[in-house]
């Protein structure tokens, strides 16, 4: 009797995904980025607790697909935030996926090259690098 191999017959390859620890080790957060995040969280807490008179405004692109354009947006938003900081606390929304998309491109993490290569491993690293770059702006 001949055994028919039916397991993984349509799988071309297996790639190992990096763990969060591996990504953090390759792309550690700097002291400046840590300060940005910590300071921002503290400000939001004060605003929500009404210990700060400002309003906070969350703005940003629907989904990051071009990190160069996204970082340009972040720089411009930072300049605006500095300008209106006495009345508003502006926070950049950064989202990498297309949660309501059922066809087509699913997002930067799933397909960072927008070529259906689905290099999620690279997408996770590129997404973290983008967040670190934005946090470095202060």
Give the predicted meaning of each segment.
Residues 50, 83-84, 137:
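Alpha-helix C-cap/termination motif
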Residues 33-46, 78-91, 97, 127:
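N-terminal beta-rich core of secreted/periplasmic extracellular enzymes
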Residues 65-84, 117-129:
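Glycine-rich anion/phosphate-binding loops
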Residues 2-6, 87-138:
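Active-site-facing alpha/beta catalytic cores
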Residues 9-51:
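N- or domain-start disorder-to-order transition segments that initiate the globular core
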Residues 45, 49, 65, 93, ...:
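Residue-level signal for functionally critical sites in structured catalytic/ligand-binding pockets
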Residues 60:
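Conserved, mostly hydrophobic/aromatic
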């Amino acid at each position: 009797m001949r055994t028919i191999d039916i397991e993984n017959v349509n799988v071309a390859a297996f790639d190992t995904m990096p763990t969060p620890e591996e990504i953090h080790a390759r792309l550690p957060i700097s002291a400046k980025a840590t300060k940005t995040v910590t300071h921002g969280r503290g400000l939001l807490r004060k605003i929500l607790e009404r210990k700060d008179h400002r309003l906070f405004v969350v703005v940003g692109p629907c989904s990051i697909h071009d990190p160069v354009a996204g970082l340009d947006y972040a720089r411009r938003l930072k300049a605006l935030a500095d300008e209106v900081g006495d009345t508003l606390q502006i926070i950049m929304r950064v989202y990498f996926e297309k949660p309501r998309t059922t066809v087509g491109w699913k997002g930067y993490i799933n397909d960072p090259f927008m070529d259906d290569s689905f290099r999620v491993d690279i997408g996770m690293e590129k997404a973290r690098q983008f967040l670190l770059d934005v946090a470095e702006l202060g």
